[in-house]
């Protein structure tokens, strides 16, 4: 469903940037779906995202939840015919051979039951900190936070950042809108907003040991820092 076609333009801030709060509200008003998905537009979603959500919904282990996943960065240079099984198989093979899993802080989508996130702060789209808030807030209210990364492969089509009028550092971290998002989020929530409390793998759905979750974050910290250090030079 396209909110723009069914609902019209969502609310914007003074700089004309869309508000996530209005988009989430519009989605809840327009759809009676059990689960809503927010996803960045530069990724390729494969069918096992939906089958994974169906598995969790049928599980007796959790009721309400929020699921998330990291992306796999890949240079996609040719158009893909998803109606052709061979083309999809080739993509998956390319992902396996050449794809690079993004750092632990890079969440590419959120899927949550309709009873959650009905009212959120007025975060703006495309700036930092709101995504960390989603997971940190869920944890603060005891909502299961499920990491789909190991099972669900989400392909991020590598691109430049020429659409930005400034650096990635300004857009995501130091700019006015990023700082406003940070204020609304009550901080950056980097650790709590980048890890789950449950994991979905080929072996099923299981609750994580917090010691392992924290270890996973700290083990990936060097890659996160390398990414941030590149921000001032990426336009």
Where are the regions that the model predicts?
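Conserved catalytic core of nucleotide-sugar-dependent glycosyltransferases
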Residues: 44-136
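Short, high-confidence coil segments that cap the C-terminus of an alpha-helix
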Residues: 32-33, 61-65, 143
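Preference for well-ordered, secondary-structure-rich cores of eukaryotic proteins
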Residues: 21, 38, 102-105, 154
């Amino acid at each position: 469903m396209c909110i723009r076609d069914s609902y019209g333009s969502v609310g914007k801030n003074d700089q004309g940037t869309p508000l996530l709060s209005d988009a989430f509200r519009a989605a809840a008003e327009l759809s009676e779906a059990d689960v809503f998905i927010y996803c960045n537009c530069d990724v390729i979603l494969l069918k096992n995202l939906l089958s994974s959500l169906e598995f969790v919904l049928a599980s007796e282990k959790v009721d309400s939840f929020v699921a998330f996943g990291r992306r796999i960065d890949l240079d996609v240079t040719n158009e893909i015919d998803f109606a052709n099984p061979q083309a999809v198989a080739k993509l998956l093979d390319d992902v396996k051979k050449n794809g690079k899993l993004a750092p632990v802080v890079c969440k590419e989508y959120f899927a949550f039951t309709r009873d959650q996130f009905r009212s959120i702060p007025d975060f703006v789209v495309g700036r930092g900190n709101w995504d960390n808030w989603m997971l940190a807030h869920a944890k603060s209210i005891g909502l299961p936070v499920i990491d789909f990364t190991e099972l669900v492969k989400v392909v991020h089509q590598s691109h430049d950042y020429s659409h930005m009028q400034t650096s990635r550092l300004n857009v995501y971290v130091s700019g006015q809108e990023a700082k406003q998002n940070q204020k609304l989020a009550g901080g950056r929530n980097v650790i709590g907003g980048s890890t789950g409390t449950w994991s979905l793998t080929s072996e099923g759905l299981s609750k994580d040991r917090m010691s392992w979750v924290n270890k996973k974050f700290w083990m990936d910290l060097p890659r996160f820092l390398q990414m941030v250090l590149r921000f001032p030079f990426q336009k």
